[in-house]
Design a protein with these regions (language model features):
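Bacterial N-terminal signal peptides
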Residues: 7-16
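Histidine-acidic metal/acid-base catalytic patches
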Residues: 21-45, 49-66, 165, 174-183, ...
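Short glycine-rich, flexible loops that bind phosphorylated cofactors or substrates
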Residues: 77, 136, 218
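N-terminal pre-domain/capping segments
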Residues: 4, 19-126, 144, 268-279
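Active-site acidic/histidine proton-transfer and metal-coordination neighborhood
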Residues: 31, 54, 74, 94-181, ...
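Conserved residues at the C-terminal ends of beta-strands
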Residues: 71, 104, 130, 212, ...
């Protein structure tokens, strides 16, 4: 009787497994349009200046974004090694990689030292920074010492330094080739420049890109959802391919920062739609 029961149980288990295998599997989503491109789609941590890390990561998960430029309000520069390890473990839960730190403003050699050591402990090879002009030769020294890339974040007409890609280029062209720029296409546009032309012209020094749209090519222009402003995104995506950009295009959404989520989704969706439509 016991053998019969065991045999019946085995037959039942085989039947269940066979039935499960015979059921059609529901198809999953297609991979994001940037799959197969040389560049990646990411998120600038500053987008979540009003929110904690968990909220940021849940948003990246919902939008299928896997690269984060780390801001120090999510991982303070004073973090211990244990806190840094816990931070990376949290990112891993959401299949997110922290690929850079910054932007970090640097007004002294001591602040530059602190930023480079922070990046080393975090385990990234790219710093997005804003050093005073007179400190660039010290940045050059630290780049040689650490072997990192250093991307200067341009800021349009709003602050006195690094208004556009041309200005960054003129200040770094004779320095170590690992010193370049984070091409913020919105700020570049607001200073009257063409980010498509600037990407082509300065491609050898473009190490990171911040994606946003703006309403005008002047200081009066302001940030809004990607696709609603004046930037020619189809031309920009084509130029990414033409120059073979291999870095990350990170959305830096600066509108409705206390409730940015609809704008983030719209912007990522539009940018990916352009990637798909221009293949």
């Amino acid at each position: 009787m016991k053998k019969l029961f065991t045999l019946m149980l085995l037959v039942l288990m085989v039947s269940i497994i066979t039935f499960a295998q015979d059921q059609p599997q529901r198809p999953g989503p297609q991979p994001p349009p940037e799959t197969g491109e040389t560049f990646k789609v990411g998120m600038a941590g500053y987008t979540f200046a009003k929110f904690d890390l968990e909220t940021a990561l849940k948003t990246l998960q919902k939008t299928d974004v896997h690269y984060l430029c780390i801001k120090d309000f999510h991982l303070p520069m004073t973090s211990t090694d244990a806190e840094i390890a816990a931070f990376h473990a949290k990112l891993k839960e959401y299949d997110v990689t922290g690929y850079a730190v910054g932007p970090i403003y640097m007004k002294s050699e001591a602040e530059i030292d602190k930023a480079f050591e922070y990046a080393k402990r975090v385990g990234v090879k790219l710093i997005v920074g804003v050093p005073n002009y007179e400190l660039l030769h010290y940045v050059d020294k630290k780049v040689k010492e650490y072997g990192f890339n250093y991307a200067i974040h341009l800021h349009g007409p709003d602050i006195a330094i690094y208004p556009d890609a041309e200005d960054v280029w003129e200040h770094v062209k004779d320095l170590d080739p690992r010193i370049g720029m984070c091409l913020d296409i919105g700020h570049d546009t607001r200073n009257g420049k063409d980010p498509v032309a600037d990407l082509k012209k300065y491609q050898s020094r473009v190490f990171d890109i911040h994606i946003k749209d703006v309403t005008a090519t002047t200081k009066l222009g302001y940030s809004l959802e990607v696709g609603r402003g004046v930037i020619d995104f189809p031309a920009f995506v084509r130029m990414l391919r033409e120059v073979g950009y291999t870095g990350v295009c990170s959305l830096e959404h600066e509108k409705d920062m206390t409730d940015p989520f609809m704008g983030i989704a719209e912007s990522i969706g539009y940018f990916r739609g352009v990637i798909a439509a221009t293949k």
